[in-house]
Each structure stands twice: as C-alpha cells, then as structure tokens.
Amino acid sequence: MGESTVTSLEGREQAVPASVAAAQRPGPLQRLRTPRRPRLWFEILLIAVSYWTYSLIRNAVPEQRAEALRNADWIWRMEHHLGIAVEESVNHGVNAVTWLIVGMNYYYATLHFVLTLAVLVWLYRAHPGRYGAARLALFATTAVALVGYYLYPLAPPRLMNGNDFIDTVVVHQTWGSMASGDLKNMSNQYAAMPSMHIGWSLWCGLTIFTLAKLPWVRILGLLYPTATLIVIVATANHFWLDAVGGMICLAFGYAVTRTWSGALPHALPKQPRPGP
C-alpha cells in the first residue's frame, strides 16, 4: 500500500496511508461547491451568454394576449375587492410631475441593468469568496421567473382595456424602454409576472446591505428596491403584486444557493480558500 506524508503540529513529517490521504481529498462535487476565485474572462462570457439566453427564452414565450388581459383584469378586480388597488392613483399622481415621471422612465429602462452589473463587479473585486454564491442566487431567481412568464402571462396595467392607466413612455416620448414605444415589438409585452426589476433590485439591495461596511451605503441598499417598487407602479409597467412574485423568485434563488453552497452568500468567507 502506498503512503503519503503530512506535517504534524510540531513540524515533523509523518507517513499516512495513501487510502487515508485520498479520502481526505475533496471529491469532484465538493470541489465544485467550494468557493473559488472567479476568472474574469469566464464571468464576462457566462453573464453575457446567460442574459442573452434569458432574453431569448423570455421573448420566445408565446404572447398569449387574451389570457394575459384576463389575468390582468382578475388581479385588478381582486385588488379592488381587497382595497389595495393603488396603482392607477400612483400612475396619475406621478405623471402630473413631468420631471419626476421622465426620470422614472429612464430609471425603469436602465438602472436594473446598470446597478446589477455594478454589484456583480463589486462582488468580484471585493468579495471573491462570496461572488459565486451570490451570482448563483441571481441566476436561479432569473431562471425561475421564466417559468412564471410561461405559466402566467400577464398584461401590464398600461395595456389593459377599459382602464385609464397612462403609458408614460409613450406620453413623454422617452427612450430606452423595450416595454413600450418604438421598441415594444422586440420584447414580450405580457411577461409582467414576476417582476424581475424587483427580483434584481432586491438582490442588489440585500447584497449591499449585508456586505457593505458604511452605514449610509447599507441604507441606500435598502432604499433601492423600495424606489424600484414605486417606479414600476408609477410607470404602469407592473401591478404591485408582480413585485411579490419577484420576491418569491428571489427567495427561491437564495434557497438554491443555500442548498448548493451550504450557506447564504454573506455567511461565506470573503476570500476563497486556496485550493489544491
């Protein structure tokens, strides 16, 4: 039987049977689950391909217009029955302040991309040991959202029939949103449930809150998903219940991460353990 050596606490080398040494080495699955330093080129390629795949699948889901409008009418009636149908009032109130609604239109069109990428870059540079687990939570959240788009097509409030919601992008002729205006034919108009604006912004907010050191930065982390909720309602792109769907997807994403990594991202070491 072959032998290998280990170094004792006193610095002396001792022979260890090869079978024992082999048993102490992590297996392939354990090595995959162990946090490691991410490779920049691989992460750029992975994120680009993953987002392209997500967009392709999301927009390939059949636009079931009639069912999406029925589902929107049902949610709107249910909210009225429960006394929580505030979306139209918020939409009209914010639309009356031109500079505010124009800013919200651009916020809706851009920030969920920009800030999500910014948080990923920050994790990559400052928390490489937690990066992989946090990225897995984001990817799992986004993947399960695709199931929602397929199983529950939902029209946004601005596309409902017989209601007075204002399509703020059309009215104020702002650019950037693929949900309405000239770019609407490039995006699935009936993929409102769940809201990934909320799923992604809450992921960003919780990541910042749990990992940032400065108190004011942590507070900004919590304010970001709150502001996003106001924006998606004010622009009539979502019911607020769509935000609940996004939160449920994020909870699923964190559950996947907890199962795979054995801990949530913030509980993992900041720096990856050196591997063999």
Where are these regions (language model features)?
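Aromatic-anchored segments of alpha-helical transmembrane domains
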Residues: 52, 56, 142-150, 223-234
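Hydrophobic transmembrane alpha-helices
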Residues: 205-209, 250-258
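Alpha-helical transmembrane spans of integral membrane proteins, capturing the lipid-embedded, hydrophobic core
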Residues: 43-55, 113, 117, 138, ...
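Alpha-helical transmembrane segments of integral membrane proteins
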Residues: 34, 38, 42, 46, ...
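Membrane-interface loops
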Residues: 58, 65-77, 86, 124-217, ...
